[in-house]
Amino acid sequence: MIRYKFPKAIFVACTASVMIVLAPAVNAQSTELKQVFAQLGATPVVRAQFEQQKKLASLNKIYVSKGTVLFSKNQGVLWQIQSPVKADLVVTPRKLVQKTQRTTSQIEVDKTPYGSVATMFLQLMSGNEAALAKNFNVVSANYSPMQWNVSLTPKSSLFKKLFVQVDAQGQRYVDRITILEQANNRTIIRFSQQTAQPQTLTAAENALFQLAK
């Protein structure tokens, strides 16, 4: 197995963004929170375009990356980054795999601190509400059929090292995620063209997920 250290900026932002999709389950006592969770968790496959803007306060510079994301409850999460470089990031319960045109690198989730983040998210996809309750406080949650928003702050020391607060908003799906990180850095991820179709994964998508089995 190839030992590989995944790029922190891409992995943290992507992982945080996929976690937020199921973060409304943190507080089972909140009616609005449960409504958000039920709405977002009702679809087994979601596809979307994404644009990530990462602002580094110390450099006063914004880095932009774009691509597509595929969320599958049965398989995992597939981020296909199209710019500024092309790469696929596959997250499954066992492995994290990054594939480029020239290389394929993988690491088992229990061999890296970030693996625990990915594992926790995948547990949430199967309905393990207790996992987020161990790591997040819900600052606010508002729901209506036309609009919802959720704000979270981390409990665990691991997440506190990564970010200060996560805000998400959307309608039927997640539309925007704002991650306030340490040192006043900020990552904004916007999702567009969200769709639940096609539900069936392509041969190429299945092949990528097989790399992380």
Positions of the model-derived regions?
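N-terminal mature ectodomain segment of secretory-pathway/periplasmic proteins
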Residues: 42-93
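Generic beta-strand structural signal
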Residues: 71-72, 91, 99, 143, ...
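Acidic/charged, solvent-exposed loop-and-adjacent secondary-structure segments enriched in E/D, K/R, S/T
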Residues: 100-123
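N-terminal secretory signal peptides that target proteins for export/translocation
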Residues: 1-7
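Gly/Pro-enriched, hydrophobic low-complexity segments
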Residues: 133-137, 142-213
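Bacterial N-terminal signal peptides
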Residues: 12-21
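N-terminal leader/targeting segments and the immediate start of mature chains
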Residues: 24-51, 55-60, 206-213
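Short hydrophobic/aromatic-rich beta-strand segments that constitute the beta-sheet cores
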Residues: 50, 77-81, 96-99, 150-152, ...
